[in-house]
Amino acid sequence: MGMYLLHIGNAAVTFNGPTPCPRSPYASTHVNVSWESASGIATLWANGKLVGRKGVWKGYSVGEEAKIILGQEQDSFGGHFDENQSFVGVIWDVFLWDHVLPPKEMCDSCYSGSLLNRHTLTYEDNGYVVTKPKVWA
């Protein structure tokens, strides 16, 4: 089982789902996470199946200084990174919407988000990180 952590502000929830690094180098795990401020409900989907729902920080508002951190656990917002707690593998695409998607859309492979365009992001790589376009669909 894989462990997925979602941090909202200084609150966090943990989901146990499929291992994020399949044995075949060409297989992938499709992961979707939603969080709604009004209810505080976070939902994790993996490979089109609901993994679970948990409450995390109802009413929290994401500020202008928000950061999206992928593949690295932090002990606190803005805290330090530990290379022994790093994701090892490939992240192909990242999309972000300004609303919670309905379950049907959450299960589908989506093509773009409404808030995040990874091609216009500023990246900060820590350790050995390679950023390249994907070579297969």
Swiss-Prot record:
Which tissues is it found in, per the record? Not expressed in the intestinal tract including ascending colon, descending colon and rectum. Not expressed in the human colon cancer cell lines HT-29 and CaCo-2.
Under the GO molecular function aspect, what terms does this record hold?
A: metal ion binding
- Residues recorded as binding Ca(2+), renumbered to this chain, are E73, D75, Q85
Segment forming the signal sequence: none
Which residue intervals define the domain Pentraxin (PTX) in the entry?
Answer: 1-137
Which keywords does the record carry?
Calcium, Metal-binding
Q: What is the species of this protein?
A: Homo sapiens (Human)
Record lineage:
Eukaryota, Metazoa, Chordata, Craniata, Vertebrata
Q: What is this protein called?
A: Putative mucosal pentraxin homolog
